[in-house]
Amino acid sequence: MSLDTLITHNTLLPATPDAQPDACALVLMGGGARTAYQVGVLKAIAAMIVAQLPGKPSPASPPPAFPFQWLFGTSAGALNACYLASQAVHGLDALPRLATFWSALRSERVYRLEAPGWVRANRIVAGLTLARQVRRHRALLDTLPLVDTLHRAIDLDALERALAQRIIHVLGVTASSYTTGEHWTFCQTRPSHPVQPWHRPGRRAEFQPITIEHLMASSAIPFLFPAVPLWVDGHKEHFGDSGE
């Protein structure tokens, strides 16, 4: 997914004539470690915004406004984008809240490998155990812990409120269809947004409510995490990490 693609298809155009002409877009790439670095940068941006405020804000004063109106992400970057969108109703506090979320994240809240420690001592047994894991979960790792983590962390109702209140305009999540090989950008806007789905060689865009399934599809690393079925064009296709 590129910013040029989003601009070309008018995804970043203001939804209404009275929308802010200087609104900002945030496009977040994937990659676990890189995504953690993104959190640090965003936390620093929040601190710089606060430092530029006139006077010293009191603890009782409301936080500054959320600084981004268009959020797009792929893979782990999509998780960050969606989390921020769901926290946008809290203004600038959304950025340090994302850092708090990452600080509490542990591997057991992301995946589960059903193999006792003693299995590693025998290559044959380890191979058989991993093969059983693949048959059961369609991948090496069980990602149900991540599903639970995202359901607990991301308030999709708050995301809809942020869109309805025009705090944000668009949330976009990209994923690759293993069925067709096309890259999809799933976008959620408020109902009055005029942008229509678009299609160009190898790339599609669909406007529909973002769900945890979209996030799991975008972050489904091939072979490690299972592909996720999503409904597109009236049928199911299996999606995974777009690698973009």
What do these predicted regions represent?
Residues 137-175, 182-186:
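Active-site periphery "cap/insert" segments of enzyme catalytic domains
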Residues 20-25, 33-144, 150, 187-200, ...:
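Patatin-like phospholipase
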Residues 13-18, 59-65, 156-165:
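Surface-exposed acidic, glycine-flexible loop patches that form ligand/cofactor-binding
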Residues 1-27, 178-194:
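Small-residue-rich anion-binding loops in enzyme active sites
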Residues 30:
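Extracytoplasmic "Venus flytrap"
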Residues 164-244:
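Active-site gating loop/helix substructures
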Residues 14-18, 54-58, 220-221, 228:
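Acidic-glycine-rich active-site phosphate/pyrophosphate-binding loop
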